[in-house]
Swiss-Prot record:
Record text on subunit structure and interactions: Fungal cytochrome b-c1 complex contains 10 subunits; 3 respiratory subunits, 2 core proteins and 5 low-molecular weight proteins. Cytochrome b-c1 complex is a homodimer.
Taxonomic placement: Eukaryota, Fungi, Fungi incertae sedis, Blastocladiomycota, Blastocladiomycetes
Signal peptide region: none
UniProt superkingdom: Eukaryota
Co-factor requirement: heme b
Organism, scientific name: Allomyces macrogynus
Membrane topology note: Multi-pass membrane protein
Protein name: Cytochrome b
BP term (GO), one: mitochondrial electron transport, ubiquinol to cytochrome c
Primary role: Component of the ubiquinol-cytochrome c reductase complex (complex III or cytochrome b-c1 complex) that is part of the mitochondrial respiratory chain. The b-c1 complex mediates electron transfer from ubiquinol to cytochrome c. Contributes to the generation of a proton gradient across the mitochondrial membrane that is then used for ATP synthesis.
Length: 382
């Protein structure tokens, strides 16, 4: 133990993974941070292995994926672990963020922690989009065409920017090469940001369900929380490998098993499920530029959250009105996800607009107003 604390490198690992003091009352909702680290390791290991056999060429990409599935030793397992690992990565990150929203983990002194986390989330979405293009199936090709075309909504420079991203006048070989290179690079940038996230967490410690300072009631990370995390790992692997072995394509799209054909447009262009809420926001606004602003605004508004919160009480556990609106927000998010997967027709367009309005209203109106009203009631009581 003395060696761990005196070694210049191992002392850092010791302070983060062994001696790090955590509140004694944190629940299993706090396990998702470690699960996200596990997901990132799975994605990097399987992704690097897949890259050894993948050919980033429009004529070979689809065939190389089939080669991985059929000819590479346990290639099917590596590919399905990578594809389902992305979905589980987002499941864990959405729960992790929902816990942060519920317990106000974004307020001072954890503003930097929250901001870095949001940047990680946005970078995750970019990485996942780039990866979705690589199999070069129908949904990959047309998804890339639709999403990259959104840049053309930018006045004056939009068209030139789209052609710059494509590397030509359409989604083609140059685009696939660029997306593959970036998809390989971004996970390592994500890993670096995760280290920054952990440093920010270590600065002020973790939040807790009560939302109060817990400096007098803390436990070391090891052995109390390492074993707790191991329980979470076992449950995670049980569910994860259940999908990988028995339902590997449940969260995918059958059109992506058809080779990309620029001459045949799919009946419905649907992104992966974790993009659907923001895809619904994009389609809910009639203006192309307005839809793009709405979609990116829905992500960037999370960065402004620490400054929108006005309540002096941390967490929704002691705020019944806020708790009601939070769970309404969760239901609203799932409704957006459902609408994003449907055809752009009534009643889904109207429902998407209502859900989009509530999404922004929750952050811009409900959170600040309820906080001010609660503070006013506290002052009146005193």
């Amino acid at each position: 133990m003395r060696f761990l604390k005196s070694h210049p490198v191992l002392s850092l690992a010791n302070s983060f993974l062994i001696d790090s003091p955590l509140p004694s009352n944190i629940t299993y909702l706090w396990n998702f941070g470690s699960l996200l680290g596990l997901c990132l390791v799975i994605q990097i290991v399987t992704g690097v292995t897949l890259a050894m056999h993948y050919a980033p060429s429009t004529s070979l990409a689809f065939v190389s994926v089939e080669h991985i599935m059929r000819d590479v030793f346990y290639g099917w397992l590596i590919r399905y672990a990578h594809a389902n690992g992305a979905s589980f990565f987002f499941i864990c990150v959405y729960i992790h963020m929902a816990r942060g929203l519920y317990f106000n983990s974004y307020t001072k002194p954890r503003v930097l922690l929250w901001s870095v986390g949001v940047v990680i989330y946005i970078l995750m979405m970019a990485t996942a989009f780039l990866g979705y293009v690589l199999p070069w199936g129908q949904m990959s090709f047309w998804g890339a065409t639709v999403i990259t075309n959104l840049l053309s909504a930018i006045p004056y420079i939009g068209t030139a920017l789209v052609e710059f991203v494509w590397g030509g006048f359409s989604v083609d070989n140059a685009t696939l090469n660029r997306f593959f290179s970036l998809h390989y690079l971004l996970p390592f940038i994500l890993a670096a940001l995760v280290v920054v996230h952990l440093i920010a967490l270590h600065e002020h410690g973790s939040n807790n369900p009560l939302g109060i300072s817990s400096k007098v009631d803390r436990l070391p990370f090891h052995p109390y929380f390492t074993y707790k995390d191991l329980v979470g790992f076992f449950v995670f692997f049980l569910i994860f490998f259940g999908f990988v072995f028995y339902q590997p394509n449940l969260m995918g799209h059958p059109d992506n098993y058809i080779p990309a054909n620029p001459l045949v447009t799919p009946v419905s262009i649907v992104p992966e499920w974790y993009f659907l809420p923001f895809y619904a926001i994009l389609r809910a606004i009639p203006s192309k530029l307005g839809g793009v602003i709405g979609m990116f605004g829905a992500l960037l508004i999370l960065l402004a959250l620490p400054w929108l919160e006005t309540s002096k009480v941390r967490g929704a556990g002691f705020r019944p009105v806020m708790k009601f609106f939070f769970w309404l927000f969760v239901v609203n998010f799932f409704l957006l996800m459902y609408c994003g997967g449907q055809h752009a027709e009534e009643p889904f367009i109207t429902l998407s607009r209502i859900c989009t309005a509530y999404y922004f209203m929750y952050f811009l109106v409900i959170i600040p107003v309820i906080g001010h009203l609660e503070n006013l009631l506290h002052r009146c009581r005193d």
